[in-house]
Amino acid sequence: MKMSERRVGSYRKSTLRCWDWCKEQRTRAYIIWRCLIFLLRWDDY
């Protein structure tokens, strides 16, 4: 019983780590996207 509990705990930890990485990637992509839009608009003027 304790083995399975420990396994679930480690799985949850790795999932949270993956989620943090995904959020970090999304934030970085969003910032790059905003910069690109800003530069494109700047070219239009």
Swiss-Prot record:
Keywords tagged on the record: Cell membrane, Developmental protein, Membrane, Transmembrane, Transmembrane helix
Listed GO biological process terms: negative regulation of cell population proliferation; shoot system development
Entry-linked InterPro entries: DVL
Chain ranges passing through the membrane: 22-39
GO cellular component: plasma membrane
Subcellular location: Cell membrane
Segments of this protein annotated with the region Required for DVL/RTFL small polypeptide activity: 13-44
Topology versus the membrane: Single-pass membrane protein
Claim: Transmembrane is one of the keywords in the record: yes
Family: Belongs to the DVL/RTFL small polypeptides family.
Cited function: Small polypeptide acting as a regulatory molecule which coordinates cellular responses required for differentiation, growth and development, probably by restricting polar cell proliferation in lateral organs and coordinating socket cell recruitment and differentiation at trichome sites.
Annotated protein name in UniProt: Small polypeptide DEVIL 23
